[in-house]
Amino acid sequence: MKKILLSFMAIFISLSVYSQETTSDVKGFVSDSSGNSVGGASVSVVYVPTNAEAKASSNSDGYFVVSNLKSGGPYSIVVASAQGTKRYNDVFLSVGAALSLNVVLEATDEVVATASLITRNVAPGPSTVFNLADIEAAPAWDRDIKDVITQDPRIFVDESQSYRGFNCNGSNPRYNALSVDGIGLNDGFGLNSNGYPTSRMPFSYDAIEQVSVEFAPYDVMYGGFAACVVNAVTRSGSDTTSGKFFYEFVDDSLQADSLEGDSLTINPYEETKYGFTLGGKVPEVENLYYFVAFEQYDDFDPYERGYVGSGQANESSWLSEADFNRIRQIAKDVYGFDPGGLSKGSPSEDVKLLAKFDYFISDQHRAEVVLNYNDGFEITPADSWTPVFESHFYERGHELQNFQ
């Protein structure tokens, strides 16, 4: 029995920490027209997409807090007592922050307020929050949240490197911390330079609803970083079933073969991205919602180096085809090793799947189950030397599974 109780305590403690990192709060002070605090005022916070309601009431000093709310919106907030009623429409909450309200009740009919003019989100330290509108409007050509968060001048993405690492206030990407719905996705062994534990972003771009970047959060729940903390929150289903599909394609046939009359040497390459999202309400189950996001990336990058006469974009003047074949034959005859032929290019693949279920149990409790899966590989050179043999390249794969 004690073991069972301890298990439940551990679960609730972890859920408490999780909710603080990835959800939002609404807090405030209720007063009448004379400035006196109003105790016992009812507070109703309704998440409009699902009509899920969270309730609270102000204490004897007029203060109230509604915790563990899903970030985003829109929300409708109603504060009511014998002194009057006030409604806030189109309220949007920021991940990891608390919305602060100063509610003044008047003895008149219901007052409807514009939330954006009288509310503010309070975060624990310097931070930036990007909502769904920011994510959808960003020119994310690589389908990566780096293309969103780089709008903050304190973040720099190194476009000169293929891995596109992002630096917070000039620090190495390995000093950052990344979480998705409270799941830590850090590069624990420091094998990558892009700030991720995988070769590409380990979750679907279309699955993200909000991203926050916190540079110096003064909160004990944060740790394991020295630069910044990136918190991403995934989308959820609603009462309306909706989805989307995308397909992107580019290859060498879409590139010009000459420039100002001079012919260009173009090696074959191809890149394809496609995926879908689907979200809605689970049929015949009250207050249960689902969201699924899938994304796949296939790529073939040409290797542009070769011997003289190979037709590659960059031919080594010191290496002829005869020398290339002689080196290969010596390796086979003397050392019993075949270094392979001329490398033509390197394929890569990346598959992402995210499934999420939200269950609104009551006006005080909400359950969330998230599965995130990422699998892929890339062909990469063994070191920075620029040879042309196939044996110099190897397959570097990764597989990531998270469930909570």
Task: Give the residues covered by each predicted segment.
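Extracellular loop and loop/strand-boundary signature of outer-membrane beta-barrel proteins
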Residues: 196-197, 260-264, 339-343, 388-395, ...
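Outer-membrane beta-barrel pore domains and translocons
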Residues: 116, 214-216, 246-250, 293-297, ...
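Transmembrane beta-barrel wall of Gram-negative outer-membrane proteins
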Residues: 242, 267-377, 398-404
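Outer-membrane beta-barrel translocator domains and adjoining extracellular loop/strand segments
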Residues: 255-261, 303-309, 348, 380-388
